[in-house]
């Protein structure tokens, strides 16, 4: 009888525990999380900063019609400062058009002009990156995994992703690399 009560208590406990919470230790040690970006907030301090981890197990292809691809995945923004220590979970959907990858732009410009200027290539790559993204806030946690209240303002409009936005561009490229084992800008469409 006591054994049945204990088993029932364990089952109830298992179903009432939050399963999606994430801790800083899990982000730092689990192989499914890839550190994509690090930025020190204050170079004079030994700790603290902005860290972005990509959950490589969460990435899924939502559209596959080469040269267009769409991927959806989850990433975590870790903010560690003296006044704030949080983990923000976000879902990112990125549309990729490899007609605008850097390698394709170089290849097509060489086909049209055997000696393209570097300036023309830079202007072409900055005018359109071939990436568009949608970002949705999912949750906010403390470093030990406790859920924090969060104000959700989710704008589901797609907006172009510029190569100068290195943080988001690196996340999008890491997602592409995780699924297709090559960088987005290395693909040549002929």
Question: What label would you give each PLM region?
Answer:
Residues 2-8:
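Sec-dependent signal peptide recognition
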Residues 8-9, 19:
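Cleavable N-terminal signal peptides
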Residues 14-18:
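N-terminal signal peptide c-region/cleavage motif recognized by signal peptidases
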Residues 21-90, 97-190:
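N-terminal secretory-pathway/extracellular module detecting exported/lumenal segments
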């Amino acid at each position: 009888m006591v054994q049945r009560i204990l088993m029932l208590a364990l089952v109830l406990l298992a179903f009432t525990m939050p399963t999606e919470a994430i801790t800083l230790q899990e982000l730092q040690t689990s192989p499914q999380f890839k550190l994509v970006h690090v930025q020190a907030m204050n170079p004079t301090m030994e700790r603290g900063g902005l860290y972005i981890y990509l959950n490589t197990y969460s990435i899924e292809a939502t559209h596959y019609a080469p040269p267009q691809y769409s991927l959806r995945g989850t990433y975590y923004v870790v903010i560690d400062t003296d006044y704030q220590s949080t983990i923000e979970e976000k879902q990112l959907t990125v549309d990729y058009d490899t007609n605008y990858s850097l390698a394709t732009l170089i290849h097509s410009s060489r086909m049209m002009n055997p000696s393209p200027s570097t300036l023309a290539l830079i202007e072409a790559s900055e005018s359109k990156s071939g990436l568009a993204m949608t970002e949705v806030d999912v949750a906010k946690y403390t470093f030990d995994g406790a859920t924090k209240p969060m104000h959700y303002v989710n704008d589901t409009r797609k907006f172009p992703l510029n190569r100068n936005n290195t943080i988001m561009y690196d996340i999008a490229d890491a997602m592409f690399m995780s699924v297709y084992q090559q960088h987005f800008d290395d693909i040549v469409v002929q």
